[in-house]
Amino acid sequence: MINFKNHKLIFLFSIIFFSCSEEKSEFEPSDSQIPPNILLIIADDFGKDYTNGYIEGNLKPQIPAIDNLRLKGLQFNNFWSYPTCSPTRASLITGKHAFKTNVLQPGDILSTNEKTLHSYIKEIPSNNYSNAVIGKWHLSGNNNMINPQTYGLDYFAGIIGGGVQDYYNWRLNTNGAISNNREYITKTLTDMAIDWIQNQNNPWFLWMSYNAPHTPFHTPPVQMHNQGSLPDYNDNLDPKPYYIAAIEAMDFQIGRLIQSIDASKINNTLIIFIGDNGTPGMVSQSPYGRQKSKGTLFQGGINNPMFMSGFGVNRLGIDNNLINTCDIFSTILEIAGSDQYDSMDGKSFLELLEIDYEHRKFQYSEMQNGTQNSKTISNGNYKLIRKPNTDLFFDLKNDPYENNNLGVLNLNSSEKSALNELLSEIENIK
């Protein structure tokens, strides 16, 4: 296992500067005594059907920066988030399942009594991490009353609510100070991240939370995308080119961000990229479609892209382990040197960066629609979705896109055994 806590191993690398080049080179070993920088990049409403490397979907954007992370790192095929943004973010920052934080749907408020990832990292002796969240927050409700710094952040710049009405006309919150901004938001957020990183003398943890490619559909600056000359969007137009353009513009800015990191620091930086939930129904592609996309517990709503690349990622290629959102909390804590990384619902998968092993036997997600709660659990082969008035049971190995509900009656012995196992485990979680 990699010993990030003591930083006494020398790591071999297969990435150089995370540039958009496909040429493969090796990093020089970094100073093993310096705690690694951690860059967590979150894309908003970005599913597998629009991500290269996954078989879902036919339309794929040109995203060389994200591709570079994937090709020179580890691709996770079975990462589960929540169906919407706020629960995913609450689980990432607390290491808890959604029902334990009461953040079950967009706009729910994370209690200021919750201890966050940033607060845990601050308590690590001698590491002296600086931390920041730049971009979308959406854990203080929809009325923007609670400043993100209340949750243990050193620095916040971005939008507190769930999104913007206009990518070119929006309100920027910088540590509580509000200003109007008329620059393309994806670029502005990246500029602020670049400035923040360049001003750090200590190891740093940056939570880089883009609001792209979330609606509204729009036309990004032409130099940032490959969709040609798009007219202003209206409801009579196909939204897919606009959605792809926003993804490509985000990737353009991710490339800028990564390339801006000084060579002496990039050697010592771990990058994690995730989508916070599935693709919106308006643009969701086969095999998902509108009914099995964002806002649902089907795979198209919760089984999302995740890549890790850089410092300590010595195992390259594809990983098929079951990963929960809260596991990222635990993994970041262990990387940063905390001994409390498995104290919540999350389970660190740090060893997967070195070797393949069974990380966990079950994965879990849930959602609230109004006053009704639904939840789902899987063992990788079978999946159970428990709705208020019905249960859905699927054989994911033979039916990965959940087209054939097996029900709970007339099951064969293997199916009955799997169903009973999932029913038992979901009760243990609750």
Question: How would you describe each model-predicted region?
Answer:
Residues 25-387, 391, 400-424, 428:
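Formylglycine-dependent sulfatase
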Residues 396:
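Carbohydrate-binding surface patches
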Residues 2-4, 26-27:
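Short, aromatic- and cysteine-enriched interfacial helices/patches
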Residues 4-12:
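Sec-dependent signal peptide recognition
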Residues 22:
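Short, conserved catalytic or interaction motifs in soluble domains
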Residues 18-19:
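C-terminal motif of bacterial Sec signal peptides marking the signal peptidase cleavage site
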